[in-house]
Amino acid sequence: MIIDKTLFLKKYLNQSSLNEDLYPIVKDICENVRLHGDDALRNYNQQFDQVETCNLEVAYQTLENAYNRLDSDLREALQQSHARIQSYQESIKWTKQQGTSDCYELYHPLERVGVYVPGGKASYPSTVLMTVTLAKVAGVKNISVVTPPQLNGIPDIVLAACYIAGVDNVYQVGGAQSIAALAYGTETLPKVDKIVGPGNQFVAYAKKYLFGQVGIDQIAGPSEIALIIDDSADLDAIAYDVFAQAEHDELARTFVISEDEALLKQLEQKIQHILPQIERQSIVQASLNDNHFLIHVNNFSEACDLMNQIAPEHASIQTVSPHDYLNHVRYVGALFLGYYSPEVIGDYVAGPSHVLPTNQTARFTNGLSVNDFLTRHSVIDLSKDTFDTVELTARKLAHVEQLYNHEQSIEIRTSKEFNDDKN
């Protein structure tokens, strides 16, 4: 169905992507893990994943063995992806002292980080690379991965990615319970400073509940893409861009925006023609039934405005002049320009992390980067000469705020000199 911008904004845009009924369930899970530690984790593995886990931690040798079992072409693919991610993240890392000679900022890596790697419907070695590599470039001392247990063990491809990226520990536990374990620490899992990585609604709510106890990257909703297209776009490619997003899960959201209503109708027909032939059809069909939107706009300005209001995780511009949109599309997780920059390349190998804000949160937050694994603090290191130029201002402001001990803290330094060598 094709709808216009006004109807879309009124009826569909602000729908919540999270099920509020899950929040009390997640709270109970987290509290149970806090109180009962490893025993709770083993019970949840049995209850939710039907897997009995005597050992929650995966032996490190298992990672190397998994890597060695992989076909050489898969090892090469993982290594190329890792190399591109590493190179890009090194290029954007905050490393230099910023500021002036007497006021500046310093950066330090976090000590312990936990990474959630989804499992279940698919294996996600790419998530390992798109998170752990960033933490390693930042200089994080200890990186723990949690991922749901499986009857036949964690897939080799995921363990091999952990080996390549340099993970320190892997634990077979998933869901809200794994987030709680990393936040509180258990007999086996270490308490971490920050948790990153995408997951389902249970994972998202666990992060929300535990934020403050531990740092988080974001509270992620279902994956999403918004595309702006014109008659230069290849509709077969656009259809598969839609399918690629929709196959993540039934809640994944896809938006296609165009000034050309006839083109949107052609795309709708193309999607229906190809759909019976694709893999993972049932998941894609469910996503398209409830969360797929073809939106007609009147002009360039409306297209950009709508994209900024949707603020999607992924924005793709497939028009005759995609770079025209570069400074007008502002609030997106990542922006993909042109035919040869499909969103899927960003999922695996481009370089920026594929852990991105969803559900309009790109209007105020950013995708994961190496700098999310650094702390930043200001350093104030004044000489007496500089102090003498600013102390009166500080005293006046302290006085007007009636913070008289603040004022006295400055006053005492105007009457007593301290021998130093900064003058």
From Swiss-Prot:
Zn(2+) binds at residues 245, 248, 347, 406. Binds 1 zinc ion per subunit. It holds the Pfam family Histidinol_dh. Its cofactor is Zn(2+). One of its GO terms (biological process) is L-histidine biosynthetic process. Its EC number is 1.1.1.23. The keyword Oxidoreductase applies. Belongs to the histidinol dehydrogenase family. This is Histidinol dehydrogenase.
